[in-house]
């Protein structure tokens, strides 16, 4: 069975969206294989997670945001879970996310000099899922 990794980001936890996100995962028929609440995430872990972005001019605010508060991380499984979860999340940029997606319903567009608060992360490929699961668990 295919697996993917997800994060409910600090904005999702702070805004009380954990239950809503987990409900959508379960309603879709996916199995929650692992779930862990992290009250604090280190900069080192975030740097490893976003290794392809480290060094980019836009990266420091992402690191700051991802270490700003608690997160919920997990592994879900099911048929075509990577593709389906990414569809359920919606577009990265809130203004492009369709209604009915997690980001379309709950994400906040960034103002000038603000970081996008898009509630969730999901692995973008089978390779990324394996790497991220090994990194976080």
From Swiss-Prot:
Molecular function in Gene Ontology: ATP binding; metal ion binding; nucleoside diphosphate kinase activity
Binding site for ATP: 9, 58, 86, 92, 103, 113
Enzyme Commission numbers on file: 2.7.4.6
Main location: cytoplasm
SUPFAM superfamilies the UniProt entry points to: Nucleoside diphosphate kinase, NDK
Disulfide bridge map: none
Active-site residues, Swiss-Prot/TrEMBL: 121
Example GO biological process: UTP biosynthetic process
GO CC annotation terms, alphabetical: cytoplasm
Signal sequence coordinates: none
Keyword Cytoplasm tagged: yes
Compartments reported by the entry: Cytoplasm
InterPro entries to which the protein is assigned, alphabetical: NDK-like_dom, NDK-like_dom_sf, Nucleoside_diP_kinase, Nucleoside_diP_kinase_AS
Subunit structure: Homotetramer.
Protein family membership: Belongs to the NDK family.
Function per UniProt: Major role in the synthesis of nucleoside triphosphates other than ATP. The ATP gamma phosphate is transferred to the NDP beta phosphate via a ping-pong mechanism, using a phosphorylated active-site intermediate.
Protein name (database record): Nucleoside diphosphate kinase
Organism: Streptococcus pneumoniae (strain ATCC BAA-255 / R6)
Lineage, uppermost ranks: Bacteria, Bacillati, Bacillota, Bacilli, Lactobacillales
């Amino acid at each position: 069975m295919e697996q993917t990794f997800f994060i409910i980001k600090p904005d999702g936890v702070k805004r009380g969206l954990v239950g809503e996100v987990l409900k959508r995962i379960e309603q879709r028929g996916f199995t929650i294989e692992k779930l862990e609440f992290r009250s604090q995430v280190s900069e080192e872990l975030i740097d490893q997670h976003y290794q392809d972005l480290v060094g980019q001019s836009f990266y420091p605010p992402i690191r700051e945001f991802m270490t700003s508060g608690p997160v919920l991380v997990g592994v879900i499984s099911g048929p075509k879970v990577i593709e389906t979860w990414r569809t359920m999340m919606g577009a990265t940029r809130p203004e492009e996310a369709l209604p009915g997606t997690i980001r379309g319903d709950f994400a906040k567009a960034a103002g000038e000099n603000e970081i996008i608060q898009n509630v969730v992360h999901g692995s973008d490929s089978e390779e990324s899922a394996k790497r991220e699961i090994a990194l976080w668990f």
